[in-house]
């Protein structure tokens, strides 16, 4: 084979080898892991929005505010709820509920009142994570993530959470709309404002 012909063959082999598709590295899985860990570690944020709850044969809508300050979560619901609103504060072990009349209930009485008002046991400990678009690290979960490394659905603690919309907040994607379902309970949350 002549030198020009050999050179042409070598160039063709190099071009063909250079054009082959390499498998994508598993960056997305690692990136989701890093994003999830970062958001699960976030302990200061606030949202304002609207919630629609359907539980058994009952339902209501309300404005909602969630404030996370360290391990303390504060939930404020204003709307029908039979009396106009309520405030719930929990640190994961204790629960305090203050109703629209200023009456304060603690622990089991607060849990019973909250369940009666909402129509279901609210997963408050997990909500602080689900609001951020990540699973609660304290229990197993089944996660479905999109190409942007955002949860689209989550199954955890008998709840199914669907994330329908994300909004850009200070350079990162945070949930704008989600639906939580369990048995005969459906909760739709629309976040109108993030303060992270």
Model segments located where?
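A short, Trp-centered hydrophobic/proline-enriched beta-strand micro-motif
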Residues: 37-57
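Sec-dependent bacterial lipoprotein signal peptides
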Residues: 1-19
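Gly/Pro-enriched, hydrophobic low-complexity segments
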Residues: 133-196
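Short beta-strand segments that buttress and anchor functional surface loops
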Residues: 49-53, 64, 75-77, 152-156, ...
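An acidic-aromatic
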Residues: 72-121
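Extended lipid/amphipathic-ligand handling interfaces
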Residues: 64-67, 88-90, 164-168
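Flexible, processing/modification-adjacent segments and terminal tails
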Residues: 100-157
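Bacterial Sec signal peptide processing site at the extreme N-terminus
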Residues: 13-36
């Amino acid at each position: 084979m002549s030198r020009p012909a050999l050179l042409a063959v070598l160039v063709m082999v190099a071009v063909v080898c250079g054009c082959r598709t390499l498998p994508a590295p598993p960056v997305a899985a690692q990136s989701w892991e890093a994003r999830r860990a970062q958001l699960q570690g976030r302990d200061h944020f606030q949202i304002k929005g609207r919630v629609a709850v359907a539980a058994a044969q009952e339902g209501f809508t309300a404005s909602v505010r969630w404030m996370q300050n360290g391990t303390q979560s504060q939930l404020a619901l204003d709307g029908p709820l039979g009396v106009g609103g309520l405030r719930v504060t929990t640190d994961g072990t204790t629960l305090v509920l203050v109703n629209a009349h200023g009456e304060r209930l603690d622990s089991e009485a607060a849990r019973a009142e909250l369940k009666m008002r909402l129509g279901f046991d609210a997963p408050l400990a997990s909500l602080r994570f689900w609001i951020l678009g990540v699973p609660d690290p304290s229990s197993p979960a089944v996660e479905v993530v999109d190409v942007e490394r955002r949860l689209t659905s989550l199954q955890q603690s008998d709840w199914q959470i669907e994330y329908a919309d994300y909004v850009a907040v200070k350079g990162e994607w945070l949930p704008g709309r989600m639906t939580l379902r369990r048995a005969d309970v459906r909760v739709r949350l629309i976040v109108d404002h993030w303060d992270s």
